Amino acid sequence: MAVSQNIRIRLKAFDYRVLDASTQEIVNTAKRTGAQVRGPIPLPNKIEKFTVLRGPHVDKKSRDQWEIRTHKRLLDIVDPTPQTVDALMKLDLAAGVDVEIKV
């Protein structure tokens, strides 16, 4: 019994529009080369909040709050063909998207 090979792709970005465009580009490339795609699965967002003092010296009650939201997506490519792997290696994604690939 042969074990099927899967490729798991995790994408992270601060801007969800860029992330969704990159995800759609990967899905279209994989489907065009004959692979089956599971996903994109939206993963929970990571929200980091920072509180800083407005003034440099006194007035502790005056503060600013900032946050960074990290959006994540998960893709599984089931039984990829060699053409799929080549197409994914040559794919040029937008700047600001972090890609992690596990085979």
UniProtKB/Swiss-Prot annotation:
<keyword id="KW-0687">Ribonucleoprotein</keyword>
<comment type="similarity">
    <text>Belongs to the universal ribosomal protein uS10 family.</text>
</comment>
<dbReference type="GO" id="GO:0005840">
    <property type="term" value="C:ribosome"/>
</dbReference>
<comment type="subunit">
    <text>Part of the 30S ribosomal subunit.</text>
</comment>
<dbReference type="InterPro" id="IPR027486">
    <property type="entry name" value="Ribosomal_uS10_dom"/>
</dbReference>
<comment type="function">
    <text>Involved in the binding of tRNA to the ribosomes.</text>
</comment>
<dbReference type="GO" id="GO:0000049">
    <property type="term" value="F:tRNA binding"/>
</dbReference>
<dbReference type="GO" id="GO:0006412">
    <property type="term" value="P:translation"/>
</dbReference>
<dbReference type="InterPro" id="IPR001848">
    <property type="entry name" value="Ribosomal_uS10"/>
</dbReference>
<protein>
    <recommendedName>
        <fullName>Small ribosomal subunit protein uS10</fullName>
    </recommendedName>
</protein>
<dbReference type="GO" id="GO:1990904">
    <property type="term" value="C:ribonucleoprotein complex"/>
</dbReference>
<dbReference type="Pfam" id="PF00338">
    <property type="entry name" value="Ribosomal_S10"/>
</dbReference>
<dbReference type="InterPro" id="IPR036838">
    <property type="entry name" value="Ribosomal_uS10_dom_sf"/>
</dbReference>
<keyword id="KW-0689">Ribosomal protein</keyword>
<dbReference type="GO" id="GO:0003735">
    <property type="term" value="F:structural constituent of ribosome"/>
</dbReference>
